Swiss-Prot record:
Entry keyword set: Isomerase, Lipopolysaccharide biosynthesis
Family membership noted in the UniProt record: Belongs to the polysaccharide synthase family.
One Pfam family matching this protein: Polysacc_synt_2
Function: Epimerizes UDP-galactose to UDP-glucose.
Class of the enzyme per the UniProt entry, highest EC level: isomerase
Entry superkingdom: Bacteria
Species, as recorded: Rickettsia rickettsii (strain Sheila Smith)
Enzyme Commission number(s) from the entry: 5.1.3.2
GO molecular function: UDP-glucose 4-epimerase activity
Catalytic reaction equation(s): UDP-alpha-D-glucose = UDP-alpha-D-galactose
The name this protein goes by in its record: UDP-glucose 4-epimerase
PANTHER family: UDP-N-ACETYLGLUCOSAMINE 4,6-DEHYDRATASE, UDP-N-ACETYLGLUCOSAMINE 4,6-DEHYDRATASE (INVERTING)
GO biological process, one term: lipopolysaccharide biosynthetic process
Keyword Acetylation (UniProt): no
Length: 341
């Protein structure tokens, strides 16, 4: 897929970027690829990655997706883009919604415009379950980001830049997520702070997140949205699983929901399920390719579609305590923390 091609990863020093590079290095894909450009604004993280990976095929570009000129110049000669740069912390975005808009919406506009301008072959835009039925600023900004990508995809002719979207559930042990928080609390002998015990979240590994993006990259058509089917757990079961794994007796304290949190998350809305393709491990939601000339639909009508149940962390496969423990023990992060416990 990547032979003699140049790939750019925006926000490439984050959890996803590190997971992709780990996959490429272990699988040997890095040997076939021409160049991987890491585009991000944190010079310290770039330097850490440069030293840790020490691979001549990695090229580092300091810049911000909010600045069109910096992303446009860095994208010259790029064949493919994985757009992972984002503000993703829900409470932070609640307090600074314009910052979420500037990065997640306007920043994405810059990335997509630069990709089209530089005749990039395909762009995969990384979104989130919080973009479905959004109630918080982060989810709203990501929902608008998706709409922006699909609108641009709708205007592309055959042979032009292909724009696809992937939606994640909760990526376990990613930066700023709850698993590192619980493990730190366990190690420090503190109470485990749970917002709401019955709250459910999808459980997706960083390996799964890379699989999803590569699947979309290989199979995606213009304007497609891809979702990976994932199991879920309540937050209380997740905390108890970590207690068992680390042989912890820490107390659990319920603190109530944080700003902008939902009781459960949705990956596919009921309206989207009506047109989604079930691809066994994934759902593909095709783009609505209709234009603004709706007259023909009033005259000819439109076939009726069944309203299906949405795909949520409440109605997906629910893992019990032992299943969650088994899943957590597959994570490199958890294994490393156990070694250092």
């Amino acid at each position: 897929m990547f032979v003699d091609k140049t790939l750019m990863i925006t926000g490439g020093t984050g959890s996803f970027g590190n997971a992709v590079l780990s996959r490429f290095l272990k699988s040997g894909i890095i040997n076939d690829i021409k160049e991987i450009r890491i585009f991000s604004r944190d010079e310290k993280k770039q330097e850490d990655m440069r030293i840790a990976l020490n691979n001549p095929k990695l090229k580092f570009y300091i810049g911000d997706v909010r600045n069109y000129k910096s992303i446009d110049e860095a994208m010259h000669g790029v064949n493919y883009v994985f757009h992972a740069a984002a503000l993703k912390q829900v409470p932070t975005c609640e307090f600074y919604p314009m910052e979420a808009i500037n990065t997640n919406v306007l920043g994405t506009e810059n990335v997509l415009s630069a990709a089209i301008n530089n005749k990039v072959t395909k762009v995969i835009v990384l979104s989130t379950d919080k973009a479905v039925y959004p109630i918080n600023a982060m989810g709203l900004s990501k929902a608008l980001m998706e709409k922006l990508a699909i609108a641009k995809a709708r205007m592309r002719s055959s042979g032009e830049t292909v724009l696809c979207v992937t939606r994640y559930g909760n990526v376990m042990a990613s930066r700023g997520s709850v698993i590192p928080l619980f493990i730190n609390q366990i190690k420090q002998g503190k109470e485990l702070t749970i917002t709401e015990p019955s709250m459910t979240r999808f459980l997706m590994s960083l390996v799964d997140s890379v699989d999803l993006v590569l699947y979309a990259f290989e199979h995606g058509n213009q304007g497609d949205i891809f979702v990976q089917k994932s199991p879920a757990s309540t937050i209380e079961v997740l905390a108890k699983a970590l207690q068992d794994i680390f042989n912890s007796k820490n107390e659990i304290r319920f603190i109530g929901t944080r700003h902008g949190e939902k009781h459960y998350e949705s990956l596919v809305s009921s309206e989207e399920m009506a047109k989604a393709d079930d691809l066994r491990d994934y759902y593909r939601i095709p783009m609505d390719g209709r234009d603004l000339n709706y007259a023909k639909y009033f005259v000819e009508g439109e076939k009726k579609v069944a309203l299906l149940e949405d795909y949520t962390s409440h109605n997906t496969k629910r893992l019990n305590l032992e299943e969650v423990k088994e899943l957590l023990l597959t994570l490199d992060y958890v294994q490393e923390e156990l070694k250092n416990a």
